[in-house]
UniProtKB/Swiss-Prot annotation:
Disulfide bonds: none annotated. It comes from the Eukaryota. Expressed in intestinal cells. Transcription factor which regulates the transcription of various genes, including those involved in innate immunity and oxidative stress responses. Binds to promoter regions of genes, probably at 5'-[GACGTCA]-3' consensus sequences. Together with transcription factor daf-19, involved in regulation of the serotonergic response of ADF neurons to pathogenic food. Modulates response to infection by the Gram-negative bacterium P.aeruginosa, acting downstream of the p38 signal transduction pathway effector serine/threonine kinase pmk-1. Residues 393-413 are annotated as: Basic motif. Residues 283-303 have a biased composition (Polar residues). Residues 419-450 are annotated as: Leucine-zipper. SMART domains: BRLZ. GO terms for cellular component: chromatin; nucleus. This is Transcription factor atf-7. Residues 337-364 have a biased composition (Low complexity). Disruption phenotype: RNAi-mediated knockdown increases susceptibility to infection by the Gram-negative bacterium P.aeruginosa. Up-regulates expression of metallothionein mtl-1. It comes from Caenorhabditis elegans. Residues 308-318, 390-400 have a biased composition (Basic and acidic residues).
Amino acid sequence: MATTMMTSSASPPESGELDVASAVASAAAALISPMVMPTSMTNGKDMTKTSQILNEYFNMMVGKRVQLMGDTTSPFSLDTPNPKLMFTPLDLPTTAELMQRCLAVNPFEAKFREANQKISSGSMQPNTSGANQSLEALEANGGSQFSGSNAGTMSDLLLKIPQASLQHSPGIFSNMLLNAGDSEGTTRENLKTADISKLLSVAGDFSAQAPRTADVLNAVLDMHSDRLHTINYLNNKPDFSALLRSPSSSAPNSASVLTNAMAIPSTSGAPFPGTTLLVPPKTVSSYHSPLGASSQPPSTQKSPADGSWDHINGEKQIKKEIPYFNDDAMMLMERSNMSSSGSDQDQSADMSNAGSTASTSTGNPVGRPQNGTPGRGRGRGRSTTADMQPDERRNTILERNKAAAVRYRKRKKEEHDDMMGRVQAMEAEKNQLLAIQTQNQVLRRELERVTALLTERESRCVCLKGVPMSDEQHADHHHRNTNGMYSGSDMLNGLGQINGMQLKLPKLQ
């Protein structure tokens, strides 16, 4: 150690530059080597090549330094090696290229590829240990593979990242670096060391508060699974709820969530206790169903062996199962009956006769529907043409249509006549109002003319003018009326106006 220190101290002054260059090369190799270790990244080959170049440069610098220490007499030993003389410009990347490659690295790809490799190789265990044990027991007993039969449920469990690996998952904002500095007018060239450390500390605080990528992926998988179970997509899949239940785990993990989702009641008719909540009753009465007894399953019909079944009840049941049809439906039935056989017509006639017998025996009022459904139309019940032959029924319906058309035309004519009468009455009233308005205008013009004549006559009247007085009398009269409101000349003229009103004054003596 002492020899080395003496040798280094005895080295020429230019060895300081060599020490600085070697230190820079070692620092660059130490900084770049952690980033290029995962070769599974997108540009892993380029980063590996860059690391190899830097390592060779570092080894060469160390060897050159040893050579300089061993032989200090050579005049060329003090020259600093130039990288441009040893490498071509394409082999040694610049700092900007290194930074660009570092920024282009996807931080998620290495983790995702590693997780996919673990899932493919089978070394990665999902969160549900009880589910895996149950599946292994099922496969050991000769059961089928779970992934092929129920791909919609267990695939989500395999894709989900376990809780133990969540802390190693990168944050969702980890790939956002210092690009936000441009918004404040500063660029990456103008940033100082203090600014960079401040931005890094702020980014670290944000990344610590932000959720991680694994949390986001697990939440998306849970939402997808819940949506599939909500739309009843996975109810036809095999039910592994008994296998997925883990008695040791008390926390609601993914397997328990899927188990609760698969326990949703459905109408598939499976013999599970939970399926009786939404399953409709098996016995559907004809009151709620528009179909007859012939279209219902055999289990819903009563057998003659039942104790509560007798001939009268049978007739009532048959009568209730006959639906109600209006005239339009009967016209459609006529067309279908034209192509049917005579046996069907006889059967329908027998059913109608049985229905009439039942209505007579029960004592229902006339016009009330017998099938249990409320009557349509004008309160009448079942159509009376149901018991007729097709030709007779057609003629009856045509006669009804003709009578209805006549009544409609008559009612329409009456409404039209009533409307025309109202129009004529309104026209007469309008003419009367116009005549009254014209008379009112004539009277107004006559009043204005008479008022103008009266005003003109009053202005020409001389009865209010008195006898002319002498100068002394006029002066004395003016002196007496000086303190009054009006002068004597105004009073003599007879046109004195008090508050805008024309008043006739008495004659002066």
